[in-house]
């Protein structure tokens, strides 16, 4: 209710405040009474360590309230006898509407020095006392279909504090208690919230620095607690931190997590946990869960994916900005000599954008950085840079592409084939922006030399994106590019640091006389040709590309890209001019629309 002057009132309400003889509790009691509530001032009157008892502290506050024209009674019971505390309210005023569990003591000791008594006394007052008072008040509140309950936690409980094992355990326990009370009371308009105050009091005197102690006035927190207890406040299960005239809401969050096995039939190993630990502890995609059902629902989703034999078994974060986009564009031959390439090379260009094939990198780097997508597919085979060849690549752009940000990429093994001389592993990945929007899909086909003859199937399953042979006619257009002798050295700066492309010894081990150009670099050149010829260099028109890497390119060789237009599908092949050999075959780009230059 509110008065004519707009002030929130508590007329007709009965408020029980424990530990109200001083500090925060006193301020709560005075403010409730000032605004019309009838107040039970509970205080045992002991020291801050819980020793002794006295009626004086509660009596002084009751006198203050009465002298100001308010109504109040004192209660001297220990909060452990919560039923007696609430009985005082019922006998004096016939109801209880508000309960502020504020009473507390300190018995600070280090972990090793904390005695059984130190532990029990602190937990009895803070946690058990709050439970007993709440348990006694709850039936009255449910019957009258109204109640407001406050639990008092602490930053020490949330973050920990040296020498307070008993106190911090109790204060964190109060958050759990409040969560359940909030759930049980909701249907009867009995709401429960947590206050996390930092204020000067008998308990903190001598602990906090003087300058901080003097500014942490309990009076500045009282209005926050009072509002949480007003009938107009509908918060339930909230944790509110307040100090020095400031307040904020706290809540717990949970990261996206990581799946620790490929399927329900696979074990969880210590080594696998170690390998994905950075994903387990990654909080970049953390979110708040409002109920235990949400947490259980997420686990059910994970189990369903495991039941299907997959899921987001591997995850990786991919960060990029204009620098990475420009480095990539230079790596696939974009040049300032071509005015239309400036949109890919200058971050202040009005049309600055990413070349779409840049977004093969999140899936590729996920595969390279973890090495688990391939090795778990062939657990009995050696998989390393010396025996893997990139066979095919599919890239699909699902939504508008940003020019900077962080992408979370989920990858899994999709198919494994036995080709005799080696194995073919198909991996799928999806990349999401920070809001959870799906931007990119990648499908990569890798040939592992010498890993075949394991008795597997030879043909792909449905869902492996097929190639499409070029039409049997003359190309509609041809574009030619000359690569630099440093092309591979430049392209590898975008993240594909397979030594095969720069180290002569590694190239020899893989069966090449000299380091070869990355297949994905050749792909980038080829897609640039498609965009230039059929999309007016507009990357927004690009939808998807599929290619097979059918031969090596030596840096410095010339690439000829032959193009066939069939509606919005552009078939192409890429040939090394010096040798006449195809290096990309069965390839096509799908455009959203075409702006042909034939």
Swiss-Prot record:
(3R)-hydroxyacyl-CoA dehydrogenase as annotated region, ranges: 1-309
Keyword terms: Fatty acid metabolism, Lipid metabolism, Lyase, Multifunctional enzyme, NAD, Oxidoreductase, Peroxisome
Motif Microbody targeting signal, residue numbers: 596-598
Pathway listed: Lipid metabolism; fatty acid beta-oxidation
One GO CC term, this protein: peroxisome
Region (Enoyl-CoA hydratase 2): 310-598
Entry GO MF terms: (3R)-hydroxyacyl-CoA dehydrogenase (NAD+) activity; 17-beta-hydroxysteroid dehydrogenase (NAD+) activity; 3-hydroxyacyl-CoA dehydratase activity; 3-hydroxyacyl-CoA dehydrogenase activity; enoyl-CoA hydratase activity; estradiol 17-beta-dehydrogenase [NAD(P)+] activity; protein homodimerization activity
Residues at which (3R)-3-hydroxydecanoyl-CoA binds: 390-391, 419, 496-501, 519, 549
Compartments, as annotated in UniProt: Peroxisome
Function: Bifunctional enzyme acting on the peroxisomal beta-oxidation pathway for fatty acids.
Additional detail: Complements functionally the S.cerevisiae peroxisomal MFE-2 in vivo.
Family: Belongs to the short-chain dehydrogenases/reductases (SDR) family.
Oligomer status and interactors: Homodimer.
Protein name, per record: Peroxisomal multifunctional enzyme type 2
Origin species: Drosophila melanogaster (Fruit fly)
């Amino acid at each position: 209710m509110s008065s004519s002057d707009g002030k929130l009132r508590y007329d007709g309400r009965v408020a029980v405040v424990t530990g109200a003889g001083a500090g925060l509790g006193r301020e709560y009691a005075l403010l409730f009474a000032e605004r019309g509530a009838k107040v039970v001032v509970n205080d045992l009157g002991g020291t801050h360590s819980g020793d002794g008892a006295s009626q004086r502290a509660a009596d002084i506050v009751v006198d203050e309230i009465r002298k100001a024209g308010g109504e109040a009674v004192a209660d001297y019971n220990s909060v452990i006898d919560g039923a007696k505390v609430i009985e005082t309210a019922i006998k004096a005023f016939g109801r209880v509407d508000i309960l502020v569990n504020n009473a507390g003591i300190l018995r600070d000791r280090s972990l090793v020095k904390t005695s059984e008594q130190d532990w029990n006394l602190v937990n009895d007052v803070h946690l058990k006392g709050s439970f007993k008072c709440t348990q006694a008040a709850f039936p009255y509140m449910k019957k009258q279909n109204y109640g407001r309950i406050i639990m008092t936690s602490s930053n020490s409980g949330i973050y920990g504090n040296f020498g307070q094992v008993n106190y911090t355990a109790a204060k964190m326990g109060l958050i759990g208690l409040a969560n359940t009370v909030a759930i049980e009371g909701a249907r009867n308009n009995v709401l429960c919230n947590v206050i996390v105050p930092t204020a000067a009091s008998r308990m903190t005197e001598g602990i906090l620095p003087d300058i901080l102690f003097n500014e942490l006035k309990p009076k500045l927190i009282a209005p926050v607690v009072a509002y949480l207890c007003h009938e107009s406040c509908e918060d339930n299960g909230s944790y509110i931190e307040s100090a020095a005239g400031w307040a904020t809401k706290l809540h717990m969050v949970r990261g996206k997590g990581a799946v620790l096995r490929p399927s329900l039939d696979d074990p969880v190993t210590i080594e696998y946990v170690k390998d994905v630990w950075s994903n387990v502890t990654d909080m970049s995609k953390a979110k708040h869960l409002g109920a235990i059902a949400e947490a259980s629902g997420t686990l059910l989703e994970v189990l369903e994916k495991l039941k299907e034999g997959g899921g987001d078994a591997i995850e990786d974060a991919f960060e990029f900005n204009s620098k990475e986009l420009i480095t990539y564009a230079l790596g696939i031959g974009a040049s300032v000599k071509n005015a239309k390439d400036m949109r890919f090379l200058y971050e202040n260009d009005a049309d600055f954008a990413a070349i779409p094939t840049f977004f093969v990198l999140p899936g590729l780097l996920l595969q390279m950085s973890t090495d688990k997508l391939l090795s778990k597919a062939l657990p009995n085979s050696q998989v390393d840079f010396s025996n893997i060849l990139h066979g095919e690549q599919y890239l699909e752009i699902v939504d508008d592409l940003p020019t900077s940000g962080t992408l979370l990429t989920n990858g899994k093994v999709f198919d494994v084939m036995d080709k005799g001389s080696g194995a073919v592993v198909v991996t799928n990945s999806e990349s999401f922006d920070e809001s959870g929007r799906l931007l990119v899909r990648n499908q990569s086909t890798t040939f592992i030399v010498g890993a075949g003859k394991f008795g597997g199937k030879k043909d792909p399953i449905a869902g492996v994106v097929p190639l499409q042979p070029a039409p049997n006619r003359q190309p509609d257009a041809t574009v030619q590019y000359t690569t630099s002798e440093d092309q591979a050295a430049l392209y590898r700066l975008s993240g594909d640091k397979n030594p095969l492309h720069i180290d002569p010894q590694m190239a020899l081990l893989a069966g090449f006389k000299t380091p070869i150009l990355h297949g994905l670099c050749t792909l980038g050149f080829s897609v640039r040709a498609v965009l230039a010829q059929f999309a007016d260099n507009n990357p927004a028109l690009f939808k998807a590309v599929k290619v097979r890497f059918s031969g090596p390119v030596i840096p410095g060789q010339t690439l000829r890209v032959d193009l066939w237009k069939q509606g919005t599908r552009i078939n192409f092949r890429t040939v090394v001019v010096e040798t006449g050999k195809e290096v990309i075959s069965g390839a096509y780009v799908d455009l959203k629309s075409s702006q042909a230059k034939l």
